[in-house]
């Protein structure tokens, strides 16, 4: 039986590990040909090897999502390889403690840390949207999912730069959804809670008990659980869904 992304072409940024890798693999299992992008082609190659070994089709692309020329090249290489882009998962990003010295109150944050966070987590999404949408307009439609966070819906202490960036992703998602709804382009975002990935492991493990106390399911999420939501939003089964923030967080946001 054909998968829900059968014959579609997907572009996944931040595809070397974590949620990005899990989603690229899930898309391939559902029949998509996948362009896996990460900072270097070598980083992306591991995910591509897993897809190809399972009988799927994928290519590796290297590039920095903070650089417009790199993003334009990612889109161009995907189209050159597969002819189109039906769905895109703009997932490249960093955790709150990955830029600068770690958890800091707002008055302690340097401008450099703030700017670096927004460059990766917000400007990167903007640039991907810009170039993906331009191509999708020419081909007559498509579906895009951006990685936001529960931090895009609430405030979190000592993470103001991360929270600002993720709120920005939610805002970009809603605005783009409205602008392009009549062009056949759907734009949504996924808002994960605490998920076990290489990016979050160091940040969360230092305060695991405190984090779990806020999650009604009392566990971390798995990248595959986020991937399933993203795949569905990219598929035609979500044809009436745009501008949405899909929370996948074990109940954190509801508590």
Model-derived segments and their meaning:
Residues 134, 178-182, 239:
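Alpha-helical segment proximal to the catalytic Tyr-Lys
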Residues 129, 165, 173:
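Active-site helix of classical SDR
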Residues 154, 197, 214, 231, ...:
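Short C-terminal tail/terminal secondary-structure segment
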Residues 3-35:
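Canonical Rossmann dinucleotide-binding motif of NAD(H)/NADP(H)-dependent dehydrogenases/reductases
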Residues 149:
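Residue(s) in the substrate-gating loop at a strand-loop-helix junction
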Residues 215-226, 237:
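A conserved structural motif in NAD(P)-dependent oxidoreductases
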């Amino acid at each position: 039986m054909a998968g829900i992304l059968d014959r579609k072409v997907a572009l996944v940024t931040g595809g070397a590990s974590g949620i990005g890798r899990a989603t690229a693999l899930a898309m391939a299992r559902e029949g998509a040909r996948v362009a896996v992008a990460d900072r270097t082609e070598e980083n992306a190659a591991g995910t591509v090897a897993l897809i190809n070994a399972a009988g799927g089709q994928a290519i590796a692309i290297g590039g920095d999502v903070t650089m417009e020329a790199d993003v334009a090249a990612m889109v161009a290489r995907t189209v050159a390889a597969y002819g189109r882009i039906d769905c895109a998962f703009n997932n490249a990003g960093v955790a709150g403690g990955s830029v600068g010295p770690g958890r800091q109150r707002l008055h302690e944050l340097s401008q450099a840390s703030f700017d670096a966070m927004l460059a990766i987590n917000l400007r990167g999404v903007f640039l991907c949207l810009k170039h993906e949408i331009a191509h999708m307009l020419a081909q007559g439609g498509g579906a895009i999912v951006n990685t936001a966070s529960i931090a895009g819906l609430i405030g979190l202490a000592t993470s103001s730069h991360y929270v600002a960036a993720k709120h920005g992703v939610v805002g970009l998602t809603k605005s783009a959804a409205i602008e392009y709804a009549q062009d056949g382009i759907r734009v949504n975002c996924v808002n994960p809670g605490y998920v076990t990935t290489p990016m979050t492991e160091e940040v969360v493990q230092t305060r695991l008990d405190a984090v779990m106390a806020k999650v009604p399911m009392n566990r971390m999420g798995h990248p595959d659980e986020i991937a399933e939501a993203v795949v569905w939003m990219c598929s035609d089964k979500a044809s009436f869904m745009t501008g949405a923030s899909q929370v996948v967080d074990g109940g954190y946001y509801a508590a």
